[in-house]
């Protein structure tokens, strides 16, 4: 039976209560307050729903992750990185990145990044938890991604691209910096061919939960101040 969250409590049910079908549906309801979202990530779940649906919270089993040291950069992407066709910044324009990620795609008219979701993650950004990666072609924003950094873990949310391989350049650059900063895992949530091409793989939900318990409160060397890479 699906658990409905109490607005007066930030607690989530145990991960093992998640449904098998649809895979990982853990709870519904609640709200998108910053405190609830932070507690959700600490607990091992994330919101994902469409306009008109209640807020749905997910913790799939298995979980798709990327270990930074396992990043695979294709020959063509490596060449593009060396050529510095684009330049990359962190936290320069979070609002534009999440808005671009929310825009309808050619293969889907609807977006799960609703207006309320954008507002919620903008608040997390203001609090210093959510971060953006921007990819620029001169002064034009052509790609990027956003997610949360907690301890030694990064929780990826969404990416977009308006130019060839722009999001790939942004993601690869981010992973290289996360490696330097001592991050141990990037949560990719659900499997995609795009993520697998970077070396992402699936691990059991319990293994993912173990990483949370060991690394969420560990310090990292992250420096998200504006930079040009």
UniProtKB/Swiss-Prot annotation:
It is found in: Cytoplasm. It catalyses: N-terminal L-lysyl-[protein] + L-leucyl-tRNA(Leu) = N-terminal L-leucyl-L-lysyl-[protein] + tRNA(Leu) + H(+); N-terminal L-arginyl-[protein] + L-leucyl-tRNA(Leu) = N-terminal L-leucyl-L-arginyl-[protein] + tRNA(Leu) + H(+); L-phenylalanyl-tRNA(Phe) + an N-terminal L-alpha-aminoacyl-[protein] = an N-terminal L-phenylalanyl-L-alpha-aminoacyl-[protein] + tRNA(Phe). GO terms for biological process: protein catabolic process. PANTHER family: LEUCYL/PHENYLALANYL-TRNA--PROTEIN TRANSFERASE, LEUCYL_PHENYLALANYL-TRNA--PROTEIN TRANSFERASE. The keyword RNA-binding does not apply. Belongs to the L/F-transferase family. Its EC number is 2.3.2.6. Keywords: Acyltransferase, Cytoplasm, Transferase. The keyword Acyltransferase applies. The lineage of its organism: Bacteria, Pseudomonadati, Pseudomonadota, Gammaproteobacteria, Pseudomonadales. InterPro entries: Acyl_CoA_acyltransferase, Leu/Phe-tRNA_Trfase, Leu/Phe-tRNA_Trfase_C, Leu/Phe-tRNA_Trfase_N. The gene is aat. This is Leucyl/phenylalanyl-tRNA--protein transferase. It is an enzyme of class 2 (transferase). Its main location: cytoplasm. GO terms for cellular component: cytoplasm. Functions in the N-end rule pathway of protein degradation where it conjugates Leu, Phe and, less efficiently, Met from aminoacyl-tRNAs to the N-termini of proteins containing an N-terminal arginine or lysine. One of its GO terms (molecular function) is leucyl-tRNA--protein transferase activity.
């Amino acid at each position: 039976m699906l658990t409905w969250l109490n607005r007066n409590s930030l607690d989530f049910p145990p991960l093992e209560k998640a449904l098998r079908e649809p895979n990982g549906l853990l709870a519904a309801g609640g709200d998108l307050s910053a405190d609830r979202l932070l507690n959700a990530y600490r607990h091992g779940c994330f919101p994902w729903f469409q306009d008109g649906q209640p807020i749905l919270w997910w913790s799939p089993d298995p979980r798709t992750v990327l270990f930074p040291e396992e990043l695979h950069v294709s020959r063509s992407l490596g060449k593009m990185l060396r050529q510095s066709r684009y330049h990359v910044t962190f936290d320069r324009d979070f609002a534009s990145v999440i808005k671009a990620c929310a825009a309808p795609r050619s293969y889907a008219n609807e977006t799960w990044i609703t207006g309320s979701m954008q507002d919620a993650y903008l608040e997390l950004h203001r609090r210093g938890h959510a971060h953006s990666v921007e990819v620029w072609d001169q002064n034009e924003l052509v790609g990027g991604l956003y997610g949360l950094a907690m301890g030694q873990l990064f929780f990826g949310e969404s990416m977009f691209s308006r130019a060839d391989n722009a999001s790939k350049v942004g993601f690869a650059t981010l992973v290289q910096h996360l490696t330097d900063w001592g991050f141990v895992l990037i949560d990719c949530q659900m499997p995609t061919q795009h993520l697998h091409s970077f070396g992402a793989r699936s691990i059991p939900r319990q293994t993912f939960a173990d990483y949370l318990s060991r690394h969420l409160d560990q310090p990292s060397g992250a420096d998200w101040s504006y930079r040009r890479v």
